[in-house]
Amino acid sequence: MKVNDRVTVKTDGGPRRPGVVLAVEEFSEGTMYLVALEDYPLGIWFFNEAGHQDGIFVEKAE
C-alpha cells in the first residue's frame, strides 16, 4: 500500500473502519501506516506485523 490509498483498519471491538494512508514507514518487523480516519483526520499510526495474519491491522479497501 502507498500514500493516498483507501484502506480499512481493524480496531478494538468494532467493525473495520475506512481511512486513507497519509504516510508509510517500513521496518524489519513490518510496516507502519499513518491512516486518516473520520474522527482522527490528522492520522493515527497502525502497525502491520510481517508474517503474522493476526498482526495485520491495515488492509487495502476494495
Curated annotation (Swiss-Prot):
Pfam families: DSRB (PF10781)
Source superkingdom: Bacteria
Family affiliation: Belongs to the DsrB family.
Name of the protein: Protein DsrB
Organism per entry: Shigella flexneri
Highest classification ranks of the organism: Bacteria, Pseudomonadati, Pseudomonadota, Gammaproteobacteria, Enterobacterales
Gene: dsrB
